Amino acid sequence: MVRVELQAASLMNGSSAAEEPQDALVGGDACGGRRPPSVLGVRLAVPEWEVAVTAVSLSLIILITIVGNVLVVLSVFTYKPLRIVQNFFIVSLAVADLTVAVLVMPFNVAYSLIQRWVFGIVVCKMWLTCDVLCCTASILNLCAIALDRYWAITDPINYAQKRTLRRVLAMIAGVWLLSGVISSPPLIGWNDWPMEFNDTTPCQLTEEQGYVIYSSLGSFFIPLFIMTIVYVEIFIATKRRLRERAKASKLNSAMKQQMAAQAVPSSVPSHDQESVSSETNHNELPPPPAPPSKEKRRKTKKKSKKKEQAAEEGRFLAPAMVAEDSVTDNSVSVGPVARNHLAEDGYTCTTTTTTTTTTTAVTDSPRSRTASQKGSTAPPTPVQPKSIPVYQFIEEKQRISLSKERRAARTLGIIMGVFVVCWLPFFLMYVIVPFCNPSCKPSPKLVNFITWLGYINSALNPIIYTIFNLDFRRAFKKLLHFKT
């Protein structure tokens, strides 16, 4: 409550003192009384500089909250990759946060600056009810998102069949229905609001102890407990999957080394990406490749010309692939897998057989970009084929998956950290104040700061839940007409 104290003003002769009402100072007096700050004729309770800083700061928070949550809603309904059932939880969360920004925050800004409620008792009751409703819906939507992620991770096959549009909409309806059940009791009498209401009566949440316990449990402490258990389980499952994928990555590396050892003889230095091999045993040599058809040679020649043009412009560098050995009456051929990759990229393989030496060369243009070597003493040229072997592809996919799992674990920590930092101070204050004596009550500025700390969670939610999602980032850029 803002108490307007009457100030004693000294008379010119000093014989007596008279009290002047605060209204007399609004227009100033003959003795040079200072005019209190006002906006549009409404007296303010704080200095003008504080009014400006507070108004700009809080208005910026409101603007960020509105823009961010509107972008989330539009992204889900306009960007096709985001039109999936689980994203309706994000839409429900965005709607709750949007109502906080539109229906709750502006009245709090005015109340913070004026320090009096000038909108009447009906608007006061509706504002407080809307405050509890929307903030509770925002928190319960966070809880629903946590449960959805938990079921999707711990039971992915069964939950994928259960996660239907009807089920998701039913969960969202339950969130809003439960929020209404928690926020509505003060409207039907469970409150300690005064019977008479004027502009000096504070518009504040009821401090009726029974309702405070009831609403704080339903709005925060029970959802916090559920989210903590769920995210701990998700974190444990994520760490377990990280360990499993790390083991799979090590196994894949061992398989890669084994395959490389089998593909390259001991007399020839092995390379992870080498695709050419030769053996001295006639029985172990693969049969020479069949000569390509005229049509295939024509297409290969055409592709080779394109590769050569690119090379001349400095945009392409053909890999040299050479493997040789001294054998008698044997032909050395490129393995079938490597040959297929080379044919796709426009390379041609030529094999020359003599009685003393075998030369295998790979050319990438009609100008005979050929690397060859005769004799068995020269070391082979390292091979760098353009195509990626299967085991390298699997290893790359596992590496990407490990990176995603680590980011997911880090995201869980950010979600819980932001939620607790924003809302825990408010609900601790909300529960403690009704049970303590007047001397332990916090100052109005501290109350306002803690309240807005909770509101800020509505501005951060669209950032947290979308900044780590590539599809949402693309949708935002598309909506804002940013070039990607």
From Swiss-Prot:
Residues 253-322, 358-383 are annotated as: Disordered. Residues 1-54, 110-126, 191-215, 434-448 are extracellular. Keywords: Cell membrane, Disulfide bond, G-protein coupled receptor, Glycoprotein, Membrane, Receptor, Transducer, Transmembrane, Transmembrane helix. GO terms for molecular function: octopamine receptor activity. GO terms for cellular component: plasma membrane. Present mainly in the central nervous system, especially in the supra- and subesophageal, thoracic and abdominal ganglia. Not found in the distal part of optic lobes. It is a multi-pass membrane protein. The chain crosses the membrane at residues 55-77, 88-109, 127-147, 168-190, 216-237, 412-433, 449-470. Residues 295-306 have a biased composition (Basic residues). Pfam families: 7tm_1. Residues 253-280, 361-378 have a biased composition (Polar residues). Glycans are attached at residues 13, 198. G-protein coupled receptor for tyramine, a known neurotransmitter and neuromodulator and direct precursor of octopamine. The rank order of potency for agonists of this receptor is tyramine > naphazoline > tolazoline > DL-octopamine > dopamine > epinephrine > 5-hydroxytryptamine. For antagonists, the rank order is yohimbine > chlorpromazine > mianserin > phentolamine > metoclopramide. Belongs to the G-protein coupled receptor 1 family. PANTHER family: ADRENERGIC RECEPTOR-RELATED G-PROTEIN COUPLED RECEPTOR (PTHR24248), TYRAMINE_OCTOPAMINE RECEPTOR (PTHR24248:SF174). This is Tyramine receptor 1. It comes from Locusta migratoria (Migratory locust). The gene is GCR1.
